[in-house]
Amino acid sequence: MKSQKTLIKMFSTAAVAAMSVSSLFAQTNLGADCGCPPVASRPTVLLTTLAGAEGQLLAKNTILTCDKTWILDDKIYVDSLKSLTIQPGTVIKGRKAATGNANALIVQRDAKIFASGTPTCPIVFTAEADNLDGTFPTASTGQWGGVVILGKSFVNLTVAKNTTSGSTTRYCAGIDGTGFIEGFSAANRRNVYGGGANVDEDDNSGILKYVSIRHAGDVLPVIPGTPADGSNELNGLSLGAVGRGTTIEHVEIISAADDNIEFFGGTVNVKYITTMFGADDMFDFDLGYKGKAQFYFGVKTATNDTTTTISSDNGIEADADDDKAAPVHALRSHPIFYNCTFVGNNRYNGNADNSGPAGLQAKELTEGEFYNNIFANFRTGVNFATARDNATNLGDGYDNWTSADNAYNTGTGVAVKGSLIIKNNTFFGNRYPITKGAMTTGKWSAIVTNPADGVKLSLGSADDMTQFTNDGNLVPTTIAGFNTVWAMNSTTNAVSTVLDVIPSSNLASTITAPADGFFTPAAYRGAFDATKPSWLSGWAYATVLKTSAGLQSNPTDINQDGMTDMKDFNQLLTRFNKANN
């Protein structure tokens, strides 16, 4: 039942004090549990003072301590065979660069980042102007570049099929299985990712745990001095061919100017991820990504937000590859998702880049497996791409999904039946459960003005809906305790109606994630278990803004170890009567 996630109205004095400490202390006085001084008292240090002329950190093992605020004032590289360690409670602030440029942290191939925060001592990357009290506008995206990690796992770029063409920046780096990461000049070989002939799917780029990345991302020109065209973008977190030896858990990406998180190939697995208020997709994968994801919570701007910066893009944007000719099945993206909750705002922005507000946008021969997820408040639950760029190699995401007995089965060419699986998901508050077609701005405009238009963008057929339903997907009209219509001012961050994405009781599923060492078996739909405290503890940005009901863990569990005991009481005593800022 949901009672464990609802704050009890009456507490003892000690419990109330513990609640205040648990939720506020970790946010406005980051790192206090770890002995870090108040953020306002920390002197600032430019990261360029630790770097060489090309932005490379000079020490073999650089350590950023929490007694200073570190300013990311350029592109800073962790070179191959070097490491960067960031202590719990540390704050790194990105400085906004001149137009056409962006300051970012780049971890190269064979380098490592060790950023292991804790629930009460998270590590925060944010904008230089953010004073960390929750008042910096969530509408302020793109204030710095973001975090980029480059690995030696798999990426399906090839010299023959992925050379420089027009304005695209997703092209091979001269060796099959390598590429230049988006957002940077291709002339710089330090921006290469992928293992080439020596792919290591278990490649280890380090650790990101209890890390918050805020107000990052940018859309940059391919050629300096020319207008940006949307093909060269930095995300909040960009992962280029990162291997499954890398640990990425309890990470949140807030107010990114492009995608919150994007996977360019790779095999890295991610767990307990939060994305909020991004300007593009919540989760974007391409170029042969084959990782796993579980317990992912994503939300767009509020449903009442009418500002010009309103985001309307996808929950998941799924691509198999960027080779439109005849990609080999074994080289396509094929991730596996369990227990995610994606909440859109049910709005349409005709000016948005690649505007396509779908819970799951299945493009470019999309493959993958999607189980036990909730997609809410999108224009369409799933959109299947049906048109290929190359007419001699037909088949696309729709044809990978449709069963052989579907009367609308049109798959030919390189489609692989059953390679896209969508089972036991819940679709709530979406205008349409299934659509088919290329979701360009024009096509969306047509369907918005004429919902019966079956030419511009087709609604799912009767056979489609039969398969959709037989696969255990549900389209309920109500979910008890689940409220995705909420109100927030993205300039002042004032929340007038809270979001609640945890149902009163679990939405049952007949499918359970396998106990394979990564997945946690969970026979319910969505990112949160209604019978347990939320995994979004007091450190998360949602609790700072108080956007969401039910996302605060047990308030008396100060150290967030799942139990209220003497350890929590002792921590309370050490903090009692101390200021929270």
Predicted feature locations:
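Sec/Tat signal peptide C-region and signal peptidase I cleavage site
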Residues: 9, 22-26
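Beta-strand/loop edge motif enriched in small/polar residues
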Residues: 27-550
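Short, recurring structural edge motifs at helix starts
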Residues: 73, 327, 554-562
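Alpha-helical segments with a strong preference for the paired helices of cellulosomal dockerin domains
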Residues: 558-581
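Amphipathic alpha-helical repeat elements characteristic of tetratricopeptide repeat
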Residues: 552-553, 566
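Bacterial N-terminal signal peptides that target proteins for export
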Residues: 2-14
